[in-house]
């Protein structure tokens, strides 16, 4: 495989979303085999103690790699048998023979445009046909996809999101972990190339000491709950992803499904943003599962959909920081 092609594939994979933009992945390349490994130094032990969000992010990276490979004229075969080992990994085998259609359904181009857009939306409804395209893109074995457009069904979900915010922002450990990953000024962004930028969080550019003060004193559980409720009510819909399996294989499958939906939404100029709070608090997640009559499925990703202007893009670390040499 030519170097420029490999670089484009790895860049596409590394543009996947991740909790707090931790970018918790490493890539090992041997010939036409790419191994995707978790980076344990980038775990979120407070908000994601079982690592389900980490593995969802790796699933998103895999899906980006598959989409990019197809666009570059390669067929990508995903081998998830490595997830059964003591140190789980994913492997993607590449061989010539993909479509070579660099923008077939627009997904390849959408990789660099996709973003979590955390601003208020304009309230416009998403056409039924476009919602159908999102549902079609979500199909993945073991993954459930649920759309909510009726205000009567959305309002109860808002209450869970509000309560999730109140519980999380009342937890000093949660707040400390969040602050650790906020980049409060351009200097921090340039130096670290990861985390949640001050612009994405709706904060001014300030020194870290002042940012910590703002987050600790001025951002309250109540204000966060109210802000989340306003954001959802400005949106056209909510979408929920569930997994039948509470293990890396199930979480990776959910990540692949979500990333296809996110890329498809991007081609339709539909924005999305995470509202995961009730999925991140175990007691609320169980209440949500019972309320929605999900059976044994686990609700893990809740997002809002709608239309809005884009926000500044989140940074990414350079490839030399995420590509490891040789076998693991």
Provide a role label for each language-model segment:
Residues 1-328:
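Acidic, surface-exposed loops and disordered segments
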């Amino acid at each position: 495989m030519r170097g420029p092609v490999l670089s484009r594939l790895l860049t596409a994979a590394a543009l996947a979303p991740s909790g707090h933009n931790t970018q918790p992945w490493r890539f090992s390349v041997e010939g036409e085999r790419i191994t995707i490994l978790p980076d344990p130094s980038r775990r979120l032990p407070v908000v994601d103690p079982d690592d389900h969000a980490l593995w969802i992010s790796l699933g998103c990276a895999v899906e980006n790699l598959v989409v990019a490979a197809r666009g570059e004229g390669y067929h990508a075969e995903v081998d998830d048998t490595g997830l059964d080992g003591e140190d789980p990994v994913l492997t993607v085998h590449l061989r010539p023979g993909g479509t070579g259609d660099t923008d077939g359904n627009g997904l390849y181009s959408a990789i660099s445009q996709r973003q979590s857009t955390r601003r208020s939306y304009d309230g416009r409804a998403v056409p039924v046909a476009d919602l159908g395209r999102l549902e079609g893109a979500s199909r993945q074995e073991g993954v459930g996809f649920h759309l909510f457009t009726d205000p009567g069904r959305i309002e109860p979900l808002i209450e869970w999101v509000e309560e999730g915010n109140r519980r999380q922002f009342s937890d000093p450990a949660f707040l400390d972990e969040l602050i650790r990953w906020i980049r409060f000024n351009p200097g921090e962004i340039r130096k670290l190339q990861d985390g949640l930028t001050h612009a994405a969080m709706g904060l001014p550019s300030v020194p870290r000491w002042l940012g910590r003060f703002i987050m600790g004193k001025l951002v309250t559980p109540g204000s966060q709950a109210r802000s989340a409720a306003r954001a959802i009510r400005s949106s056209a819909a909510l979408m929920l992803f569930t997994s039948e399996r509470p293990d890396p294989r199930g979480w990776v499958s959910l990540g692949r499904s979500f990333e296809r939906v996110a890329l498809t939404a991007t081609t339709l100029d539909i924005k999305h943003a995470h509202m995961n709070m009730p999925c991140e608090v175990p007691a609320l997640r169980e209440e949500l599962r019972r309320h929605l009559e999900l059976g044994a499925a686990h609700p893990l990703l809740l997002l809002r959909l709608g239309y809005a202007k884009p926000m500044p893009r989140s940074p990414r670390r350079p490839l030399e920081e995420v590509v490891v040499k040789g076998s693991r």
